């Protein structure tokens, strides 16, 4: 959520930043709603003060009867009626909060202006792409290996689900352990095993609700399946005041993730690129405003390390204003090279959310010996999605005979297996 005080003091800049997100100017409407809310709040405070004064006089009166006493009683009753009406108006006039909840984060100064991914800025590349490489797509390879099943899975769960078998299931497990080991041992992230069912307020805190309600799966009794472990991890500091010396806090978690893929009809309908259920290792950092820019580079580099160790070509893109996520003020996308598609595809997003999530969930820190609190900054990065990493391995490590060479760093995690070959039932 954006800071209403900042909007109040920076109306023109606010409208300018909204225009970069392709949203019409809204400062005038917000100012009007804000004035109305502040006027009601001011009246409530005045009436509360008047009630306190009159109640004190009533309490000190020697005689609890007579015209003066009864007149004061009538005044207090009238004040209570006024207060009840004003508090009702304040509690039921949610238009300002509803409007603020629909605004995305303000783009950082470094974020390029642009409408879509074609305007994203290349930051760096890693590894060489080979235009003459074998180019079967991952689902062709997986099906031929008899280790990736879509047809029978569709009978169980419908489309956008997959069943992995044998050595591909083992590769999935190996990748999870490998990624967690790298992030905990080399990058100082603390491993968490969080819940995947959360309440709506946790989704709201993370910026998923109310705007993206249709993109998640909801239960009938008030829970939602997480679309990313970011939701669970950032909420670990909700409604807390953290001592400054404990920052940064860095969490890593592997969880299954669930997305309805609303609005993705016709996109990536084959294979494992876009599924309703997928596994992902997620990174979250909690830090101070002064350190969040450096922490953004740190968490992005941690994510990149996985691809470097797997020797997978990739590039890092700075997203433009029109392509950034809702809660982010600045985002790097990491895109891995897929020979089967002959293009780079997103495998990770690494975002600095500033105090956007922290304001929603009241996550603060304070210096030693101080009573003043400041909102923390939250950051997140994929570190990485297991399915898309498997896609990249299958396509980049495929052999002429359809087998898949295991990347060197995964051989021990695979129990010494160096190659995945077709499974014969």
Curated annotation (Swiss-Prot):
Q: Which residues bind ATP?
A: 259-261, 346-349
**Pathway assigned in UniProt:** Aminoacyl-tRNA biosynthesis; selenocysteinyl-tRNA(Sec) biosynthesis; L-seryl-tRNA(Sec) from L-serine and tRNA(Sec): step 1/1
User: Which amino acids does the record list as binding L-serine?
Assistant: 228-230, 282, 382
**Does the keyword section mention Amino-acid biosynthesis?**
no
Instruction: Give the location in the cell.
Output: Cytoplasm
Mainly resides where? Answer: cytoplasm
What's any GO biological process attached to this entry? seryl-tRNA aminoacylation
Nucleotidyltransferase listed as a keyword: no
A cellular component annotation (GO) from this entry: cytoplasm
Do you know which Pfam families this protein is assigned to? Seryl_tRNA_N, tRNA-synt_2b
Give the EC number.
6.1.1.11
Reaction catalysed by this enzyme: tRNA(Ser) + L-serine + ATP = L-seryl-tRNA(Ser) + AMP + diphosphate + H(+); tRNA(Sec) + L-serine + ATP = L-seryl-tRNA(Sec) + AMP + diphosphate + H(+)
Q: Which UniProt keywords apply?
A: Aminoacyl-tRNA synthetase, ATP-binding, Cytoplasm, Ligase, Nucleotide-binding, Protein biosynthesis
Record's family? Belongs to the class-II aminoacyl-tRNA synthetase family. Type-1 seryl-tRNA synthetase subfamily.
Extract the HAMAP family matched here.
Answer: Ser_tRNA_synth_type1 (MF_00176)
Its function, per the record, reads: Catalyzes the attachment of serine to tRNA(Ser). Is also able to aminoacylate tRNA(Sec) with serine, to form the misacylated tRNA L-seryl-tRNA(Sec), which will be further converted into selenocysteinyl-tRNA(Sec).
Report the domain remarks: Consists of two distinct domains, a catalytic core and a N-terminal extension that is involved in tRNA binding.
Instruction: Name it.
Output: Serine--tRNA ligase
Lineage of origin:
Bacteria, Pseudomonadati, Pseudomonadota, Alphaproteobacteria, Rickettsiales
């Amino acid at each position: 959520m954006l800071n209403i005080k900042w909007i109040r003091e920076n109306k023109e800049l606010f409208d300018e930043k909204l225009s970069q997100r392709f949203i019409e100017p809204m400062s005038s409407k917000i100012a009007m709603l804000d004035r109305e809310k502040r006027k009601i709040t001011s009246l409530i405070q005045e009436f509360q003060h008047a009630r306190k004064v009159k109640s004190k006089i009533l309490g000190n009166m020697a005689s609890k009867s007579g015209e003066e006493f009864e007149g004061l009683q009538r005044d207090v009753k009238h004040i209570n009626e006024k207060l009840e009406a004003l508090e009702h108006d304040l509690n039921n006039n949610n238009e300002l909060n509803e409007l603020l909840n629909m605004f995305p984060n303000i783009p950082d100064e470094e974020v390029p202006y642009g409408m879509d991914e074609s305007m994203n800025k290349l930051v760096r590349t890693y590894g060489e792409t080979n235009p003459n490489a074998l180019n079967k797509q991952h689902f062709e390879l997986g099906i031929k290996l008899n280790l990736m099943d879509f047809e029978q899975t569709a009978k169980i769960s419908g489309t956008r689900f997959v069943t992995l078998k044998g050595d591909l299931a083992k590769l999935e497990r190996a990748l999870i352990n490998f990624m967690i080991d790298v992030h905990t041992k080399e990058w100082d992230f603390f491993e968490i095993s969080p819940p995947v069912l959360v309440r709506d307020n946790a989704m709201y805190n993370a910026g998923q609700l109310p705007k993206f309600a249709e993109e998640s799966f909801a239960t009938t009794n008030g829970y939602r399946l997480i679309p990313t472990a970011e939701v669970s991890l950032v909420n670990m500091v909700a409604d807390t005041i953290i001592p400054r010396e404990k920052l940064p806090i860095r969490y890593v978690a592997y969880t299954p993730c669930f997305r309805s893929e609303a609005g993705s009809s016709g996109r990536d309908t084959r294979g494992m690129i876009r599924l309703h259920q997928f596994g992902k290792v997620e990174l979250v950092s909690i830090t101070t405003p002064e350190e969040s820019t450096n922490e953004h580079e740190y968490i992005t580099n941690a994510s990149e390390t996985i691809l470097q160790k797997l020797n997978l070509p990739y590039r890092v893109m700075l997203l433009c204003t029109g392509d950034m996520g809702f809660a982010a003020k600045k985002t790097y996308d990491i895109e891995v090279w897929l020979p089967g598609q002959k293009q780079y595809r997103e495998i990770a997003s690494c975002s600095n959310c500033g105090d956007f999530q922290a304001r929603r969930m009241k996550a603060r820190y304070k210096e030693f010996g101080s009573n003043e609190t400041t909102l923390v900054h939250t950051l997140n990065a994929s570190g990485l999605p297991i399915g898309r990493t498997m896609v990249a391995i299958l396509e980049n490590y495929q052999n002429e005979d359809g087998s898949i060479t295991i990347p060197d760093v995964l051989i021990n995690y695979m129990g010494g297996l160096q190659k995945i070959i077709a499974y014969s039932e």
